[in-house]
Amino acid sequence: MSKVRLYEIAKELGKESKEVVARAKELGLDVKSHSSSVEADAGERIKSSFTKAAAPQAPAEKPVAAQPSPQKTPAKEAAPVKAEPTEAKAAAQPEAKTETAAPVKRPQSRNFKAEREARAKEEAERRKQQGNRKPQNKEQGKREDRDNRNKNRGNSNDRDRGNRPNDRRDNRGQDGRRNGQNHQGFNGQKRQQPQGPKIDFKARAAALKAEQNAEYARSSEERFKQAQEAKEVMERQNRRKEQPKAEAPAPVQPAPAPSAPAANPSPAPAAVDTRRKKQARPDKKRDDFDREEEGPRKQQKNRSSQNQVRNQRNSNWNKNKKNKKGKGNNNQAPKPVTERKFHELPTEFEYTDGMTVAEIAKRIKREPAEIVKKLFMMGVMATQNQSLDGDTIELLMVDYGIEAKKKVEVDTADIERFFVEEGYINQDALVERPPVVTIMGHVDHGKTTLLDTLRNSRVATGEAGGITQHIGAYQIEESGKKITFLDTPGHAAFTSMRARGASVTDITILVVAADDGVMPQTIEAINHSKAADVPIIVAINKIDKPGANPERVIGELAEHGVMSTAWGGDSEFVEISAKFNQNIDSLLETVLLVAEIQELKADPTVRAIGTVIEARLDKGKGAVATLLVQQGTLNVQDPIVVGNTFGRVRAMTNDLGRRVKVAGPSTPVSITGLNETPMAGDHFAVYEDEKAARAAGEERAKRALLKQRQATHRVSLENLFDTLKAGEVKSVNVIIKADVQGSVEALSASLQKIEVEGVKITIVHSAVGAINESDVTLAEASNAFIIGFNVRPTSQARQQAEADDVEIRLHSIIYKVIEEMEDAMKGMLDPEYEEKIIGEALIRETFKVSKVGTIGGFMVINGKVTRDSKVRVIRDGVVIYDGELASLKHFKDDVKEVTNGREGGLMIDGYNDIQVDDTIEAYIMEEIKK
């Protein structure tokens, strides 16, 4: 016999394939899907089952429940809407026993107990008809049972919860009991298969599945209707927007239902017939909607019963999940698409080498993908994180029509640029500033006395040894105008400090004593002033002394290029007496006159820049720096970079020790707040914020450290011999601590200049501040001694130095330090000796004694021969042996020496070849004093 496929039967009947598959399974046929083939007679059975279900019946009364049979109605035909739920079942099975019941007010409620009893009776009858029919493939039957159980779980989750909220709890209870019965029945069949009557679980599962499909069809039908209504509403709204004057379209009406026999016509049966007719007719939109719903149904079939309970209780959770997947959300209006803003291209683009594609895209407000595409068209393969060179960036900007300009990199750590940058100072904001005057001269020529007279204070009395140890900055007022004075030391050791003073000054006052004349440091001060191109005012001091000769001073200065205006030069000469305050006013007037000629101006509106005059480490305040503001205005709390250090101006004091908040141009102030002590002579600059100042200071410190490491001496083939030779030179290790940075520099330079052959000075460490415990520890480890200049050790450092036997030498005058270091270096040398001949003796007789050696009898012919002297044996004018005496006797007595004209006996240690007429020359090694 020929076979026919299920989907062909469905097409012939106008039914869906899944309904035909479900009906075939209810009839006990072994089918899996719509592609399964059945015999022709089986196909006729399936067709007849649908024909019987569609036959009309006279509903004399409304049955409440009917006996279920294996031929269940299709899922779509059993979907009641606003009608009694058991009417379709009664029509499909007219021969079933029915029970009359009162009409139910809620059409959604069902009598599941009556349905189960009817199904049980029908299954018993069918077992009698089928007999002992068994599945041909036992394993296949087990697998189908498992599939049916999974479908039962999944389909139970697809029931309509929104339209039937009252049946939710009942459905869960009934489904749970049915699942439990199915599990128990399956397990019992597996364990006790030979015992008792056999139950057709396949038919039971098919019946349960048909019931669940019917419930799902009802919910699916309503969701489809809601979706259609939402689409119609959206279409009407869109048509109103496009054609405001057009009439709104009429809502789509469902197709008229065919007439069905009914005892009491009512709207509810008509609604049922309408949906049945609509379901029977193939509809493309309906099929599409069902296919959309098929995906979630398939996913829900394999969920556990626990998830089913959760989904039934929390309907919002399930709705949200469907909305996330885009299903069942057709009634919501779509969100308007955000239009992308269009940004115009800039006219100019400032770039730097190494910019990435992403950075360029952000600057020109374009997508990185667009730039990558343009680069690809230009032949450049790049990603958005790849850096581009300058040429590629320029070509890219040409493609966009943008003018490309390369950004000039500014070294933020470079302070010197503020002093040479033309645009830093505003020429329109320049104002007159006080002149900065530096007082220079030789030692004890009266520089500090002159400044003391100017300031009416007793600074000079506090200077040790009558010389200025470090620079001082002071400000006085004359005729309503301020003058800033810098005092520099005159000692030879302070050359660097004098040069520093000349570099920041506007006018130099050269103090020369009328009785001493021009001295070495006077000449040096002249050279510093000429190198800095600073005008010189000569103050001839000590004119009150009896031996003063100003004319001789003028002549000596003329020899060194300092010509008086009276002699046709450009230097002013003023004869003064600083001690007796003579002609001091004339000197100040001359200073103001020269300053007026120079037209000294500064811009107080910019951030302050200047030079460090002096720096020291205070125990309570930390690093203290004396600054001279050259441009701008310095304020308290300004972020500042000083040399290789940085910080914020915490406090600011003037030359009188008073706290100030503002310091203008040409004003000397002392500040605190730096992280380290800077070097004297360093430049400083105020930055816009503390972050920038910190970055610049750290970068400058890093560069200084790198420069110091690069300057480290390395051994090469050229200097290998010098290195080996230097190893023979002894070294004196020194640690220098002073009160100010200038004194540290002067001491270091002076000690390095000391030349003693065979000895060199190694400065292990130098810093400002008191001698502390770490200095003592370093000195003990490096075998050095500590020199303290105008500082004292702390009590803990002193105790530690005594315990570790570390020598601390304290001084307040620099030339005494130099003299002491010279003596120490000379004492480090090995002593030198010279030979001194003390006598001669002539051998007259020799005596050979066994076990003793040869004894030579001699007579001293010149000088003397001592026991501890060395002797040479000279024979025929040739030195035969040079050694020491083993014994010296006069007759039988041991003696220390034998003088001229006397006789004695001697033995030479290690030499017995003494002969008559040999000359014995006695000598000693005498140390040479240095």
Swiss-Prot record:
Its main location: cytoplasm. It holds the Pfam family IF2_N. Residues 466-470 are annotated as: G2. Residues 251-268 have a biased composition (Pro residues). Keywords: Cytoplasm, GTP-binding, Initiation factor, Nucleotide-binding, Protein biosynthesis. Residues 27-342 are annotated as: Disordered. Residues 112-128, 136-178, 218-245, 280-297 have a biased composition (Basic and acidic residues). Residues 487-490 are annotated as: G3. Coiled coil: none annotated. It is found in: Cytoplasm. GO terms for molecular function: GTP binding; GTPase activity; translation initiation factor activity. One of the essential components for the initiation of protein synthesis. Protects formylmethionyl-tRNA from spontaneous hydrolysis and promotes its binding to the 30S ribosomal subunits. Also involved in the hydrolysis of GTP during the formation of the 70S ribosomal complex. This is Translation initiation factor IF-2. It comes from Streptococcus sanguinis (strain SK36).
